[in-house]
Amino acid sequence: MEIILYANLGALPHFNPDLDGDTPPPTVLELRAEVGLAEGLLICSPEYAHGIPGCLKNALDWLVASVEFPGKAVALLNTSARAIHAQAQLTEILTTMSARLIPEASVTLALPNQSADGAGLALDPEFSRTLRSALLALAQAIER
């Protein structure tokens, strides 16, 4: 499985349906193209003030009317056991958008400590086991 990080959430313009005509902004076209090429999506979001960050909601708003998103296999990764509101909001939003949520691939991965980097997280057996299981479930769902 190849995982490609989409790192341009902040470059997307604020959603405006008037701009979503025949020629949407280039960054929106790029987002839609990347989503279209993906066999599945892995969404990991922090929780701010009991909700998802505005930049993530903005990106999802740009995907609502796109043909690339409906039916896409989606796994949700929650990195805080206490962050239940963002996870619930994402589930509601993505269901409304006709995503194919994969419950067995949607897990809570409590970060062992704030200073852990990718290498440190990989050394944590529980974290690695849970992440590996979620990715395997997503891969299996994509193959179905």
Predicted regions and their residues:
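Active-site beta-alpha loop architecture of Rossmann-like, nucleotide-cofactor-dependent enzymes
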Residues: Y48-A49, S115
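Short, conserved catalytic or interaction motifs in soluble domains
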Residues: P17, A65, T79
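Short, glycine-/small-residue-rich phosphate/pyrophosphate-handling segment
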Residues: K72-L111, P125-R129
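Mobile beta-alpha loop/short-helix "lid" or hinge segments that flank ligand
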Residues: I3-H14, A65-V67, S98-G118
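N-terminal beta1-alpha1-beta2 submodule of the flavodoxin-like/Rossmannoid cofactor-binding fold
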Residues: M1-S45, G51-D61, L121-E143
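Glycine-rich nucleotide phosphate-binding loop and flanking beta-alpha elements
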Residues: A49-H50, A83
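Short coil/turn connectors at secondary-structure junctions
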Residues: A38, G71-K72
